[in-house]
Each structure stands twice: as structure tokens, then as C-alpha cells.
Amino acid sequence: GACGYLSCHDYAVHIIEEGADPGKCRVIDEETREKIFKAVGVEGETVYPRLPLVYCAAEWEHKETSAEYKGVQTCRAADLVAGGGMKCEYGCLGLSDCTIVCPFDALHMEKGLPRVDVEKCTGCGKCAEACPRDIIEMQDKKYEKLFYVACSSYDNIMRVREICGVGCIACGVCEKLSQGKLFKVTDNLAKADYSKQKSQKDFANIQPKCPTKVIKDI
């Protein structure tokens, strides 16, 4: 699991017998966590749920191709064969490698993109490990909503509009509105900086101003 141990029992044994950190479980609520801390006689820090962010917003209708891929139907195989025929070399290939490895049935493909069931996700990170293009990243959810730029492309605006249409165009609106604190555009791609966030409104107020609506939330 996300705690780094084989099972809940294995984790519990390490806590009791080896003094392992009792605050690594991300699927229990705060009340249960406090009970565990009290039972083992330690104080712990708040542990936030960890969710996978999919840095791509292109559904099947947005994915421009240069050739039809007929090889082995896995993302890893397709990525090795001319990127599966996709013109965007950064986007989701949509062949379900991430959903297949999820042990909690928390990820499902919908219109060519993996969708996360936040109620089932335990933050184990197996989906991120399975993605050959590294477009899935695990991130702590400290507020009701977690905002992110759903794009991984470093292509310029002309290329993005040509082969996708829903990606980041590096317009800089998010960076300007946040005065460079919450968003930063580097190499044609905007990225969020959660270390500067103080409230949910910080990102929520900027999200609707994005011209391509590529700032998503989960």
C-alpha cells in the first residue's frame, strides 16, 4: 500500500515491534489516526489523502494521430512504437496500463483518459509507476479540492492548438493572476506550486480564468 508495507497487519507489526512511524496510513480518518497515536503513545503529524493527478486533458476526440497503432494494446508498448501514432508525444495514450495495475479498482478509463474514484483510491501510487509517459503524479490533498494543470506538453502554442486544442498554451494568465506564487510557466507549460497555497480560494479564483480550461480539480 501507500504506507510502504505489505499489508495493514504487516504495518501494525512494524509499529509495535520496530517502532515504525504510525502516521503513514492515508486511508483512515483523523479520529482513527488519533486513537492509534494514543494507543502506541506517540504524537503524530497530520497525514493528508494522496491522490493521482492526471496531467493530460485530451479525450479521444482531442487526440490527433499520424498513424493507426495496431500493436500490443498497452501504453508501454505503444509508446515504444512511434508513440502509438499519437502526434502529441506527451499526452495520455489511453490504453489502460494505469487502471489495470490499480489493486483497489479506483481508476477507470473514460473517453481515453483515466478517471479517479476518490472514495476508493488509497494513494498507493501504482498507477503513477505504470505510466510510461509519467503523466500521473501523486499529490497530497490538503483542501476540499485539489487543483492542477492537466497537461504535460512542452510544445509551443501553435503545436498545441494543432494537435490537441485542450492543452496548456503557456498564455501566462494563471501566473499573472497569482503574481507568480501559485503558478509558474516554464518551457511552455504552467505548473502549480502547492507550497504557496494558503486556502482553497487561492486556486479556485484562478481556475475559471484559464482560456483553455486546462486547470482541473479533483
For each feature predicted by the language model, list its residue ranges.
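Short, loop-centered acidic/histidine patches that primarily coordinate divalent metals
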Residues: 179, 195
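Ferredoxin-type iron-sulfur electron-transfer modules and their immediate structural context
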Residues: 1-177, 199, 204-218
